Every structure is written in C-alpha cells, then in structure tokens.
Amino acid sequence: MVNVPKTRRTYCKGKACKKHTPHKVTQYKKGKDSIFAQGKRRYDRKQSGYGGQTKPVFHKKAKTTKKVVLRLECSVCKYKMQMTLKRCKHFELGGDKKTKGAAISF
C-alpha cells in the first residue's frame, strides 16, 4: 500500500518561481482517445463492411500493475508537472497516516 499526501513541498520549474513551493498532488488519468486520430480512422475504415476482425487482438499481457503517475500543480504559479512512482498494487492519495503500534484493520 502506497499512501501519498495531497500536498508536497518540491521544486517548481515555472518561470515565475524557480524555487521550492507547495504543490497540489493528484493522480494522472489517461484522457479519452480521439476518434479523429489517423490510426483510429484507418482502423475503423478497415473494420467496416464484411470480413470480421482485421487486425490482431492483443492477449499476451505481461504486467499486473501500472506505474503510478502523480500530477503536481504549483500553488503559486499553477505550473504543472508529472512524476512517476514505482509499480504498486494499491495506491492511496491523502489517506490516514500510520501510527506506531496501531492494530491493523481492514
């Protein structure tokens, strides 16, 4: 379980700052694929009509986890940057901090 705080003081590369400032942390999410991308247009054209599936469907998935990508936004100049973490099964943003000697509860 990886628990990351919602704010983090780190270096800002923005033109206004160029110093350590508090950043707001969110988890990166992939945007919706455009239907106008060249590959998608070509694929849709090829798929239309009779003939079934025209390109191979990928089945040999090797990874069980994805790398977690954090999106950091400077609270001073609103400059945004991304930062990758290691692979993990469980990721939590701004969860409760662990205390020493506390019983584990699920």
From Swiss-Prot:
Q: Say if the entry is tagged with keyword Cytoplasm.
A: no
Q: Which GO terms describe its molecular function?
A: structural constituent of ribosome
> What domain of life does the native source organism fall in?
Eukaryota
Q: What UniProt keywords apply to this chain's record, in alphabetical order?
A: Antibiotic resistance, Cycloheximide resistance, Ribonucleoprotein, Ribosomal protein
InterPro entries referenced in this protein's UniProt entry, alphabetically: Ribosomal_eL44, Ribosomal_LSU_eL42, Ribosomal_zn-bd
Q: Where is this region: Disordered?
A: 36-56
Which Gene3D superfamilies does the entry mention? 3.10.450.80
Is the keyword Ribonucleoprotein in the record?
yes
Sorted alphabetically, the Gene Ontology BP terms of this entry are: response to antibiotic; response to cycloheximide; translation
The record, for Pfam families, names: Ribosomal_L44
Q: Which residues form a coiled coil?
A: none
Q: Can you supply one Gene Ontology CC term for this chain's record?
A: ribosome
Q: Which protein family is named in the record?
A: Belongs to the eukaryotic ribosomal protein eL42 family.
Give any extra note attached to this record: Confers resistance to cycloheximide, an inhibitor of polypeptide elongation.
- Put simply, this protein is called Large ribosomal subunit protein eL42
- Taxonomic placement: Eukaryota, Fungi, Dikarya, Basidiomycota, Agaricomycotina
